Amino acid sequence: MNNEILTLQVGKTGILTGNEFWKSLVREKNLLSDFSLGKNSPTNDNVFFEESNESFFIPRTIIFDLSERDFNYIMKSNYSKMYDKNRHFILNKNTGNSWLKGYYEGISNCNLVDNILRKRIEKMNSVKYFNVFNSINGGTGAGLSSYLIEYIRNNYPKSFINCCSIFPDLYGNTQVTFQPYNSVLSIAWQGLYCDSNIFFQNHAIENLLTKNQINNELSFRKVNYIIGKTISIIMNTLNHNFTLETLISPLIVNPYLNLFFSTINIDILLSKLRKKRPSMIENKTNQLNEISMNLDLKSGNYLSSIELSNRNFYKLFANSIYDKIFYDQTRFYSQLLNQYDSVIINNNVKKENYSSLTYLLNHTSFNPVIKKIIQNFELLKKRNAFLEYYCGEILLDEANTLFRESKDYILDIINNYDNILSYY
C-alpha cells in the first residue's frame, strides 16, 4: 500500500502524546485487546499499523529517547503490547535540556539510528511518509528530533515529513532554562527539512479546558490525551483515498514554502452538540474565532482551512483540493488568500453529546507566536546566558553560527507573513 506512514516518537513529550495517539487509533479501529482485528474493524489498517507474524497489529512507530523512564512508563500500561523494546532507540544519556547535546547525541549514534530506521523501512512497501511527535522545548525532543528529520530528508529526499510539535509556554514560566535557544534551533531545522508542522501549546489547551469547565483538575495526561485524540481524528482521513501529502497540501499551498505551520480547532472534544450546525461561511468563521485552540483568529487572516466533520466522506470534494495545489501566485492571491475556504474531506468518529466539527487551520496569527519566540531568544542571547553549559563540548563559535543562521531563517518566516498580510 502506497499510504504507509512511519511514525517517530521523540523525547518525553513525543512518547506520551504519541502513545495517546495510538490508543485513540486502537479504539477507533475496534482492535481487540490482543490487537487483532475486531468484528467491525476496517481492513486497511496498514496505513499506521503493521501485521505481525501472530496476526495482530502493532503501530509502525519508532521511539527515540535518551532516558528509559518514559518508555518504561508506557510499557507498564495496558497498551504495552503495542511496543517492542528491541525495535526502539533508548539510551541512558543526559542532554541537560540542550538542543545541541540532543542533536550531537544523534550524530554520535548515527550508525545505530541508521540501523533501527532501515530495519523498519525495509518492511514497508514504500517510503514516502513520516509523522514525527516531538517538543521544541527540551534537549531530546528538540535536538535529537532535528537530527532525525535531517537524516530522513538526506536519505529519503522524496519523502513527506510532518511534525506534530508541542510549543512551550511563551508568556509564562518554564522549567527549561534554555527553552528560547531550543525553540529557535528546532523551528529553523523544521523549516529546512520538514514539509509541514501541526503545532500545539500546552498552556493554550489547559486554558481551553478550564474555560469550558471540562474538569477542575488539569494534568499533562489530559492535555496529552487531547493532542493524541485530535491528531488521530485528522489522520483518520488517511484510511480513505488521501495520503498524508494530499491531506496537508491544501494548507501549505502558498508562495512561501516556509509558511507551513497549522493548528487544530478541537471543538469536537470540548463543546456540547449544537442544535443547528452552521451552514454559512460567516457563521463558521465566527465559530472558529471563539473556539480556536492556539491562535487568536481575529488578529490575522486565513491562508487556508480544512474542515473535517461527521458527515459521510464525499469524494467529490477531493477535486477542489487538487485544484488549489496548481494555483500560480497571482491566482493564489486573488482567489485563495483573500477568502475563507473550507473543504469537507472526512468522517470523524461520532461522539454522543459532543460537537463534531474539527478544523485544521493555516493562519497568519501564527506570526506573533514566532515573533515572541525570537523576542525571548534575544533576551537570553544578548547576555550570552548559560552558553558555556548549553554548548557543552560544542565550540562556542560554532554554536553562535548556528544561532545566527537559525535566527535569520525565522526572521525570513516573519517577513513572509508580513508580506502576505500586506495583500489584505
Curated annotation (Swiss-Prot):
Keyword Secreted (UniProt): no
Pfam families noted in UniProt: Tubulin
Domain of life: Eukaryota
GO molecular function terms listed in the Swiss-Prot or TrEMBL record: GTP binding
Keywords, alphabetical: GTP-binding, Microtubule, Nucleotide-binding
Functional note: Tubulin is the major constituent of microtubules. The gamma chain is found at microtubule organizing centers (MTOC) such as the spindle poles or the centrosome, suggesting that it is involved in the minus-end nucleation of microtubule assembly.
Binding positions for GTP per the UniProt entry: N137, G138, G139, T140, G141, A142, G143
GTP-binding in keyword set: yes
The name this protein goes by in its record: Tubulin gamma chain, nucleomorph
Family membership: Belongs to the tubulin family.
Coiled-coil residues: none
Organism of origin: Guillardia theta
Signal peptide: none
